[in-house]
Regions:
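The feature marks the mature, well-folded catalytic cores of soluble enzymes
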Residues: 1-457
Length: 457
């Protein structure tokens, strides 16, 4: 897994901070005998320390150097995790910021000989999926509120990092989401219905004035409601359009970024089962009589997608009691037509030039199998250059059919190192990472990133 993730990090450095590459290559060469070169270790003095490719553990280390803040963070984490006072006092004795940051993430205390002494609380391995802990909305940052207890510590740590590092001095640009003030009055069943959780995989800053929000297994209607009010009440976010996409509450499609991602202005990758066009084509080919005989509440997955568009011009005064829902049914019939509409309206693409690439080339069983291994969860490094996993062969074929190249990350890195190519030369390409371990964690390249600054395209 380390090798896989290092390849991903090196790729990001080549595209975003190439000045760090000579140092990383030299470090790898000197420490080829080690499992992990020190340049990749956030707790090492030899860490590459880029200001463009940031690591949460390193950022946490920086704020832990402040004694007053260190005590607050330890106290907050221990309270959150239900630790004993004795455990909290033990953590307070760790004065080395790098060591403490590692403990707060892994939950592991070590003896002086580096052997494991004990677990003080569970690790947070999902911290690798930084997409979910925050969402950049132009120059603002929306902080997530996790749906599951396993990720709550990540939210707490990210709040400290955001308030005291990333947005220090600009705290007014941070947007927080929390439970309603009367949530505690609800009974257990009502609390399940009105829980407020939002995760970054369900929020896409798809254009400078257009935000997408998914209602899913992880992001609740209550959270979508609060985000809409928070955004529309703050014109400084620059957002006029908010489109909410309601998808089935399944783990296989826990966020909307597991169902589709943007590849190029005119191109998207999409899970075909959620496409109304694909559903209609299948029905036209052979009518599905079985639908008459199933439970009355049965709805095919592509028909269970619901889309809502809300619009408030920046020039208009926000009224909390006003309904900003607008009717787009004449141009958006489902998820695929929404993606086409975004390319047309937000990026100026001609209707006939919009391309949809389907997971597994829309062929069973590859479509579902490859969606499960993140064929739709791609990270765009620039317009038309995306990163994914190396195990989705039928999706690769669909990319090639649509005019894209597919190359393994290690092969591309060798071309960069040999001066055969530069990142600027790479166009219309799917770069694939090794994923024997990474894919098991249920998150792809899109999940493993949290863009803070985006170039205009």
């Amino acid at each position: 897994m380390r090798r896989e993730y290092n390849e991903y990090i090196k790729l990001l450095l080549y595209f975003l901070d190439p000045e760090k590459i000579p140092y990383v290559l030299e470090s790898e060469k000197k420490q080829a005998h080690q499992k992990q070169a020190d340049c990749y270790k956030p707790d090492s003095p030899a860490y590459f320390n880029s200001d463009k490719v940031l690591e949460t553990q390193f950022l946490l280390t920086q704020i832990l150097k402040n004694d007053a803040l260190r005590h607050r963070i330890i106290s907050g984490v221990c309270t959150w995790e239900g630790c004993s006072f004795a455990t909290e006092r033990l953590l307070q004795t760790i004065t080395d910021a790098a060591e403490l940051a590692k403990v707060l993430i892994t939950g592991v205390l070590h003896n002086k000989d580096k052997s494991i002494k004990e677990f003080v609380f569970a690790p947070v391995p999902n911290f690798i999926f930084t997409r979910d802990i925050g969402i950049t909305i132009n120059d603002h940052l929306l902080l997530s509120n996790a749906a599951t207890a396993a990720r709550e510590r990540e939210n707490l740590l990210m709040k400290f990092i955001s308030f005291y590092h990333l947005f220090a001095g600009n705290e007014d640009k941070l947007i927080e989401i929390s439970e309603s003030s009367d949530f505690f009055l609800l009974d257990e069943n009502e609390q399940k219905d009105f829980k407020t959780s939002v995760e970054g995989g369900d929020v896409m800053m798809i254009a400078p004035n257009h935000l997408l929000i998914g209602c899913s297994e992880r992001t609740t209607p209550s959270a979508a409601d609060e985000v809409i009010h928070k955004i529309f009440s703050n014109n400084k976010t620059g957002v006029e359009k908010i489109t909410v996409i309601k998808i089935p509450r399944h783990r296989a499609v826990m966020h909307i970024d597991t169902v589709f991602t943007h590849v190029r202005k005119d191109t998207w990758v999409l899970f075909g089962k959620f496409s109304e066009r694909v559903g209609q084509e299948r029905n036209d080919k052979q009518f599905a009589y079985y639908r008459y005989f199933l439970d009355k509440d049965y709805v095919p997955e592509h028909e269970s997608i619901e889309i809502f568009r809300f619009y408030k011009p920046l020039t208009e005064t926000y009224l909390p009691g006003k309904d900003y829902l607008i009717d787009i049914s004449d141009k958006v019939k489902g998820l695929e037509s929404l993606l086409r509409n975004i390319s047309i309206e937000d990026f100026g693409i001609a209707e006939n030039d919009v391309k949809i690439i389907y997971s597994g080339d829309n062929v069973f069983p590859h479509d579902e199998r490859e969606q499960w291994t993140d064929s739709c969860n791609l990270l765009a490094l620039k317009n038309g250059v995306v990163v994914g996993y190396d195990r989705n062969d039928e999706t690769f074929k669909a990319f090639v059919t649509n005019g894209f190249s597919v190359i393994k990350a290690n092969e591309l890195l060798k071309k960069f190192e040999n001066k055969e190519l530069t990142p600027a030369d790479v166009k219309d390409t799917l770069i694939v990472l090794p994923s024997a371990e990474l894919s098991r964690a249920r998150g792809g390249a899109h999940c493993m990133s949290m863009p803070l600054l985006r170039e205009k395209i």
